[in-house]
Each structure stands twice: as structure tokens, then as C-alpha cells.
Amino acid sequence: MERQQHRAQVVIVGSGYGGSIAALRLAEAGVDAVLLERGRRWPVDDAGDTFATQTAPDGRAAWLSKTSPLTDAKLDVYTGVLEFVPGSGMNVLAGAGVGGASLASNGTMCQPSAELFAHTLGDVLDYREMRERWYPEARALIGCEPVPDDVYHSEFYRSARSFADQLDKAGIPWSKVDLAVDWDVVRQEMAGTRVRSQIDGLNVFGVNSGAQRSLDRTLLARAEASGHIDVRPLSVVTAVHPADGGDGTGYHVDHDRIDERGTVVSRHRITTDRLVLAAGTLGTNRLLLRARETGALPALDAALGTRVGNSEVITARTGMQENNPRQGGPAAVIAQDWRENPLGPVSLLNFPWPDAPEGEGWITTIGSVPAPALGAFHYDPDKDDVVLTWPADDPALARAQSAITHTLDRLDEANPGSRTAFSRIGTTGGNVVGGVPLGTVTDDAGRVNGHHGLYVVDGSLLPGTGVPPALTVAAVAARVSERLVSDVAGRS
């Protein structure tokens, strides 16, 4: 099948937080760009059945796979919202669709403390600059706010209030967390005029009510409306090469157009002066490592693929007062055991469990610890893909687990009758970040060292944050995008 040839001033790969913010800032500057997204569009309508749910999973839950680690159901092969890639010691979940991971996430927007930030990014970025400019800008772009009091005190969010009450008894600080949620739509769910989604905790594969402020409906929609951004869904980028001559004056971006069952319908090549990689941790590492190891971009830094982190913690506790059978979401409350824990800072977010066993008083949490970025992606030529290696038995991870256990023990001791059913640092990571270390593989503005016109603007820049990473990804993307726009406008 012959490749069709195209030309674009700027090409963006991926439409998650990094790609969408870059697209919006380029559009505002009047710069034309093509955005390639491997997944489909997911328009939410009044029917309220756009996405699969945890209680009724189907092919929409997984990217071109008959299985998903999030369900035991056998799935039809479809271009669904989450790709699962097995690794050694750690598996990876990656978003797919126009809007990227914002479609199928908790929408949790946490800003790390100065100490947590220093642990992971302090050698590259100034926290004061991030705190005063880029975190507020990211919040404004996303449009996030904590759960309003009337929603929080409703019957649907009893589990969040129970968690907060237990934290108070244990003397563990907590706060309501900023969320990328339209609370007016949640109120409509509560009133019965929109399909029940967030209030039933049905948000893992997308939010059918439209309450999720996903990027395709917010800032990426603004970028498209400008007329400067051409979003091309179902476009799977397979390779990047230097343009003819390899003198650093541009890149070829090879990609396949597919249908919703994954069949290739046409092949394309776009040549561009500026290539912005925003394909997420998995996608960006996949493209760059493939380019280095196949000789397309052999001079990419040796640190490429390293410093991969996953700070995600999964816990479940039982023996509490009975909660509502369908727990309202997304996570409304964050425990911030950042200073009193002698073993290290721990964050815990109450996470809705839509089918928790009745009569047993379960609360589940997803949390974060500043676990060391010990993982690494490697290119496997037999698979023509990357594999994540994660040293699950490393002593540093055992220390992080001990910090989590300390927080949970305090909760159980302060709340007689409760107990921890399980706790572990996740082995299937939805918050895996890193592999393209900011300030090492790139400069501090996301420009790939030694490769003029090549940028990275997603979570692969970060080795971790100690809290769920989405807000930091967006804040760093806003910072990188300012330099990108300046470079394009100045032709530097």
C-alpha cells in the first residue's frame, strides 16, 4: 500500500493533556498544525451510552484487545479507550481516543508540595515558578474544582465523608481535591435527568453523563474551533525519521489510518519542520526508542527510556460504617500524610467502588508515594515494541510500601473495627510516567537535545510527582508550549 505524502508546519502526536495544550497555544498564536490521534472520537450525547462501564464492559473498554486487566469479560476487538501492555514487573495502561487519558481517568488534579516536587523535579524546574504561574494556568485551562458542598453532603458521597471522618479521628490532614468535573452535570445525575455515571462510580472507561471535563470537549475543542488545528483521529503513528538529508531541518512522520476494528485503510507520511510528541508515556517512549534502535534517530540520548516511575498505590479497607452501595466519584477527598509519617509522605484518595460488597463497609483508595523512578523501557526488535522493566523487589519500593502501611495502620487504630484488606504499590500502572527525563534527554523546555525541531510535551518528561501526575503534566506542558510557540514564531 503506497504512502500518501503530505506537508505540515507543525505535527502533534497525541491529544492528551500535553498535546491538547500545545494545540491550543499554537492555535492562539495563529499557527497551523496537524494533530494525529490513534483513537476515535467519543462524542457524549443524550442517549448516555457512549462508553462501556465497569458493570457492562465490551470492546469499547480496550484498545484492539479481547481482554483487559480491568474486567474478566471477553471483549470484541475494537479501538477502545485503554491499551494494556504487559511488562516485566509492571504492566502499563495507556489512554486512546481524542482527548487521551482525560477520557478515562479520575480527573484528579493534585499539586505536590514543595518537598514532593523537589524529590522528583527539583533539579530541573523551580517550584516557585511552577506554583505561581504554571499550576494556576493548568487549573484554568482544565477547569477543575473540588466537589461542592451540596454534592459532597448528598447521599451519593457518603463514602467520601466517611473517609474524611476517619482521617480526622486519626489526625491525618486531608482536603477536597480539585477535579476535572462539571458539577452541574453531576447534579443532573442526582436529579435523574442525566444517566447515572459519576454518582455510581462508573468512570473507569469514560463518563456517559458528560460530567467529565475531558479535553475533547474543552480546550482541544477550542483549539479545533480556531480553524488552525486539524485533528485526525484513527491515525496510528508508526515511525519518525529525519527528513531527507538528515540535517536537522525536519521530520517524516509515518502513520496508518485505521478503521474502528484496527484494519489499515490507508498509509500516510507527513513531512514537518516541528514535531511535537505528546503520545503519553507509552507512546512517546515507543516512538523514540524505536527510532533510536532502528537507526532512524541514532543520536538520541542514552538516558532515553530510563527513570520511569509509578507511584500508584491500591488499598482497600473494610469494617467501616455501611456506605451507599454505589459510591459517588470521582475521588473527592485526598489524605495528605506528608509530614507526620516518619517513613515518607503518603497521599490517599478515596476511590469509588461501584459494586462494593453490601453490609461490609468497604472503602478503597488510590494513592501515591514518592517511589523512586526505577523502571526502564527497552525496545524489543522481535515485537517491534517497547517493554517496561520494573524491579518490583527493590528495597526502595519495600520502604515506600512501609510508609503506606504506616498510614493505614494509623487509620485502623483510630477507627476500631476497621482493618486493611490489602495494600500494594500497583503492578498495573495507570500513572506510569517518565522515560524521557526532562533536563537530560531534553532541555528544560522539552526540546530533544541534538534534534532541532523535535519536542516532547507529555508525562514521559516526568519521573514522578508523589501525587497523581495529571496536573503536573499539564503545568509542564503549558511551560513547554510557551517555548514551542516562541520557537515557531521566531523560526529558531
Place the predicted regions along the sequence by residue.
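A glycine-rich dinucleotide-binding beta-alpha-beta segment and adjacent secondary-structure elements
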Residues: R7, D200-N203, T238-H241, R399-T465, ...
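Glycine-rich loop(s) and the adjacent beta-strand/alpha-helix scaffold that form part
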Residues: E28, D32, G39-Q54, S226, ...
